[in-house]
């Protein structure tokens, strides 16, 4: 064996990166960049609307070069889907946990209202995007989002149905569910923590209004 070959064998020689998935640090950087793009899209869609925002603006806001942007996202519609999916799945997970909890229907409704107030206060931008631009999704994505939204509403409906059957509530009509969700969803329009509005106080007021009208 020559001296060069021996040295190469001893030191392991020049290493080559195996093909396939990138190293963890590179993959982590890619995930962080994608999150930055999504966060920028949330801010811009909420401020300017989905149709009023260009992909180039999102890239500039996220500090991502135009050539690299499409490595992380396929389209502006994909960003809209990701924003609305995340928010709605979060709402569904919380609603399902409350619906299946060992609580009576009155306490479940109280918990649902409180939880919904909290997530809307935390995700006002996503809610505004859903209300204003949700119908910009079409085809499969629109259908998938509607399934998630229907599941959230079904959780509320089950709580009211159980309460009505147990004699706790005066009504379990679907219009009541729509009214409750509408009341809470519109929070994004006027909630301003800088004015002293608190999530706890708003949730308490909403619960009082709902239960005063529903509880026998």
Task: Walk through the language-model features, giving the residues of each.
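N-terminal intrinsically disordered/low-complexity leader segments
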Residues: 1-32
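Hydrophobic alpha-helical segments that form the core
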Residues: 3-4, 170-189, 201-213
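Helix-turn-helix
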Residues: 33-36, 40-78, 82
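Conserved hydrophobic residue
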Residues: 50-51, 165, 169
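Short helix-capping/turn signature of helix-turn-helix
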Residues: 73, 131-137
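Hydrophobic alpha-helical connector segments
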Residues: 82, 96-125, 176
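Amphipathic alpha-helical packing segments from all-alpha helical-bundle domains
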Residues: 89-92, 140-166, 174-178
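Short, hydrophobic secondary-structure boundary micro-motifs
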Residues: 128-131, 172
């Amino acid at each position: 064996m020559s001296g060069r070959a021996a040295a190469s064998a001893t030191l392991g020689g020049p290493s080559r990166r195996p093909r396939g998935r990138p190293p963890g640090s590179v993959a982590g950087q890619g995930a962080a960049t994608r999150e930055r793009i999504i966060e920028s899209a949330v801010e811009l869609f909420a401020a300017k609307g989905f149709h009023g925002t260009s992909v180039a603006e999102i890239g500039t806001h996220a500090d991502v070069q135009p050539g690299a942007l499409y490595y992380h996202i396929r389209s502006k519609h994909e960003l809209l889907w990701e924003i609305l999916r995340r928010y709605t799945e979060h709402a569904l997970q919380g609603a399902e946990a409350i619906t299946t909890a060992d609580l009576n229907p009155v306490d479940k409704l109280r918990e649902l209202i409180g939880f919904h107030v909290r997530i809307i206060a935390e995700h006002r931008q996503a809610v505004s995007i859903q209300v204003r631009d949700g119908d910009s999704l079409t085809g499969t994505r629109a259908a998938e989002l509607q399934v998630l939204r229907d599941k959230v509403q079904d959780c509320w409906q089950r709580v009211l149905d159980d309460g009505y059957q147990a004699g706790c509530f005066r009504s379990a009509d679907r219009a009541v569910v729509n009214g409750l969700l509408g009341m809470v969803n519109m929070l994004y329009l006027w909630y301003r923590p800088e004015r002293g509005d608190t999530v706890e106080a708003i949730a308490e007021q909403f619960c009082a209004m709902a239960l005063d009208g529903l509880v026998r």
